[in-house]
Amino acid sequence: SGLDSLSGATFGGNR
């Protein structure tokens, strides 16, 4: 996900 969460916006945003 892109902006799923604060953490997701960092490394998870790449996926």
From Swiss-Prot:
Which keywords does UniProt give here? Neuropeptide, Secreted
Q: In which tissues is it expressed?
A: Brain.
Q: GO BP, one example?
A: neuropeptide signaling pathway
Instruction: Give the signal peptide range.
Output: none
- Cellular location(s): Secreted
Classify the main location.
secreted
- On the tree of life, the source organism's domain of life is Eukaryota
Q: Does the keyword Secreted belong to this entry?
A: yes
Q: Which GO terms describe its cellular component?
A: extracellular region
What this chain does, per the record? Myoactive peptide. Increases the amplitude and frequency of spontaneous contractions and tonus of hindgut muscle.
Q: What is this protein called?
A: Tachykinin-related peptide 10
Organism, by scientific name, is Rhyparobia maderae (Madeira cockroach)
